[in-house]
């Protein structure tokens, strides 16, 4: 019997409502469910199914929210590699797979086994010890607004750039459509075995984004004394970086797993980022 986890933004009424309807739909079809314990505070009728996300044991997890909900969920179940099916309640939701109006037809397809599991590259991060891995990106930025960092970037022990900038983004192909894109980085097909190095507002005309092999080891060193920085991993975790500290990035041995009902990456680029996505968002 299939077991499906349900996680939703409990601060968004529509997401909570969809979670309730999804739970009822699955139970009526004989599917076992487990529900985020915090979500059951909004849906007390599902309390018997409540479980901490970290302890969830499921064949698949449904997230009802945006990309942030997916990133948070993935960080909490990192060691389990449970496939995630994202239902989009956010603005763009590039990591999500299903819009709210198609939720139940998508679930019918899932129950018929008409889906694939896509594996996405993760970025391992080290600062003294191993930090949580990143699905999208790691952002190194100053702790103080309007202050620049002085950083050295090395790839496979070769210095490729030294610059002053507001920060630096180390991104995966999955993250190429997120903060990296906003900072001027390219969109990269998730099948490409690469990492992106994207400066944020560099004080150097020649500084440009770099695309490097994901077999490479990237090192970023903070050079200027007295300028502390923070490393932000997928917007979920922060680590303080001090003068002459080095942050190391390499491809993780683990993967993130996503439920996919279609494989058209470029259709998603058109729909979410051009035709009906970012370019059409107002105010």
UniProtKB/Swiss-Prot annotation:
InterPro entries: ATP-NAD_kinase_N, ATP-NAD_kinase_PpnK-typ_C, NAD/diacylglycerol_kinase_sf, NADK. NAD(+) binds at residues 67-68, 72, 136-137, 147, 164, 166, 177-182, 236. It catalyses: NAD(+) + ATP = ADP + NADP(+) + H(+). The keyword NADP applies. One of its GO terms (biological process) is NAD metabolic process. GO terms for cellular component: cytoplasm. Its cofactor is a divalent metal cation. It is found in: Cytoplasm. It is an enzyme of class 2 (transferase). Involved in the regulation of the intracellular balance of NAD and NADP, and is a key enzyme in the biosynthesis of NADP. Catalyzes specifically the phosphorylation on 2'-hydroxyl of the adenosine moiety of NAD to yield NADP. Belongs to the NAD kinase family. This is NAD kinase. The lineage of its organism: Archaea, Methanobacteriati, Methanobacteriota, Methanomada group, Methanobacteria.
